[in-house]
């Protein structure tokens, strides 16, 4: 078999392959012999059809099958021989497939980039440390209470944090507009749910009162037909209800699946969850900085096939997340290209770090991660057992642990600055990660 390779771009290869005619004809003859044993031809018993008839009737189909099989087989033989690592299926251009002649074709494909991960010393990481203080715990308990607020009707003027039940009709230039009217809407004043000025205009209103509120839609309002326009809302207040926070008692604790009858026990469980959240937040921020540093220090070209595959995966995820009412291909690829490129580049870099440093998942750490996740459930032992009975889920955890080992490896070589901060600052969401160049 003759093989020649042309580098058309940094990653694209144009490989010409010639399969000897002898091999082609041998495969064609083999197919015809197989066909002869099972072919049904009028006037002949099965297995007794003359080869001349078999060739006349079936040789064309046999050659097409052989062409497809030999193209696939010889392509993979050639990439192994040439020590190439294809990043996707090739585009095939037939050149010659005549009887008695060599099978010749061109395969055009991309290869994975070859590189060594470098620049570890140029990476700067700020590693946060924090504790869950009693004040943080108190604040969290108040958040949990507010999340379970109920409202009771009152006969007084509405104030911020009250819930009002309203009917309203909105008009622009004296004309009602689509989406500008509703009946029986529940609205918590001060929640910021409505456009600026709407909720403020209801502060001080009582049940049965009608108010006219003038507002202006923001310039960046999602409905461009309304953006920047002045509107008048006629609003009828049907009822006013005041917020009532639940007491910290056994019934409240049970809503969170916590079998504790004492406030001390509940606080201990909440603190445990907050500490778990804190550890994960700190770990995530360190990881994001490491990954950003690796991206900046190792600009690499991405195979188009990998980028397209990742874009398609993100499209499918987006459709599933938002209800699946559209087809993935209806979403513009441009929406996902930046995120897809970051994922692909980081995937290549992380895989290369694993290879360079001969990393393997630490099974003790895998167990620790599973137990940490399981501790959030009521029956943690069952959750741990479930992971170890499901190879796919277990391998996903191993991948997470391996990625953490990559981060630890980089941290040993990077410049790391430790910083003590408050719990609130530590768990605050980080800025969006940098895109791959």
UniProtKB/Swiss-Prot annotation:
Main localization category: cytoplasm
Catalytic activity, EC: 5.2.1.8
Q: Does the keyword tRNA-binding apply?
A: no
Q: Domain (PPIase FKBP-type): give its ranges.
A: 161-246
Question: Is this entry keyworded Ribonucleoprotein?
Answer: no
- What Gene3D superfamilies has UniProt attached to this entry? 3.10.50.40, Trigger factor ribosome-binding domain, Trigger factor, C-terminal domain
MF terms from GO for this chain are: peptidyl-prolyl cis-trans isomerase activity; protein folding chaperone; ribosome binding
Reactions mediated catalytically? [protein]-peptidylproline (omega=180) = [protein]-peptidylproline (omega=0)
- Report TM segments: none
Q: Which UniProt keywords apply?
A: Cell cycle, Cell division, Chaperone, Cytoplasm, Isomerase, Rotamase
Q: Where in the cell is it found?
A: Cytoplasm
Name the family. Answer: Belongs to the FKBP-type PPIase family. Tig subfamily.
What protein name applies here? Trigger factor
| Gene name of this polypeptide | tig
